[in-house]
Amino acid sequence: VKLYGYFRSSAAYRVRIALNLKKLPYDHEAVHLTRDGGWQWREEYRAINPQKRVPSLALSTGEVLLQSLAIIEYLDEVFPEPPLFPADAIERAQVRAVAQIVACDIHPINNLAVLNYLKGPLKHDQAAADDWYRHWVVQGFDAVEALVRPGPYAFGTHVTVADLCLVPQVFNARRLKVDMAKYPKIAAADAACLKLPAFDKARPENQPDAE
């Protein structure tokens, strides 16, 4: 398979972790989101992903999968070991809730396209854009901190999709100077995950396109 991604993209980071946990080899194709106006706008990439976002996962069949959570669910269904969702239905719903707080509430209003719109047409400066980012991360993390049950991962002794979403978000939260001291449970789960080779290999600084 081939993963189209960007080293600092939270969404691509989630999929890298999933591929590593499943021990699935993949080719990395960089889609630099800021260089030369953004490679995602090029015609050749628009033909792969009409949404012009990352990640995209190209399968050996020729099919291309979009959206990180959809890709992760596909990988978990086709390659079930190790499972990324609990067997119990209630626990699955709880894990999905945290994953979706990150992927559906925090991330969409803080992605590069939104931040560029704030700084471009809406004429906010970088400091204002950073404040915007931190505001929504804090609001989301306040909820997540109340929901996770580290032991040592977000929901116990097994890594789940909640961890796959939290670790990339914590990386970018720290980059934008969110005070993680307020979130000891999130920080503990993040630290436990990053001790695992699959997570370490997926870190942004370990990617071929890292800057």
Regions found by a protein language model. Give the residues of each.
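Active-site-flanking alpha-helical
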Residues: D76, Q169-V170, R203
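Positions that flank functional sites
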Residues: L33-R35, A188, P208-D209
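GST-like domain detector, emphasizing the conserved glutathione-binding G-site
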Residues: V1-A128
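GST-like fold's C-terminal all-alpha helical module
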Residues: V102-K195
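Carbohydrate-binding/catalytic loop surfaces
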Residues: K119, Q207-E211
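Short beta-strand(s) of the beta-wing in winged-helix/HTH DNA-binding folds
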Residues: P55-A58, A154, D200
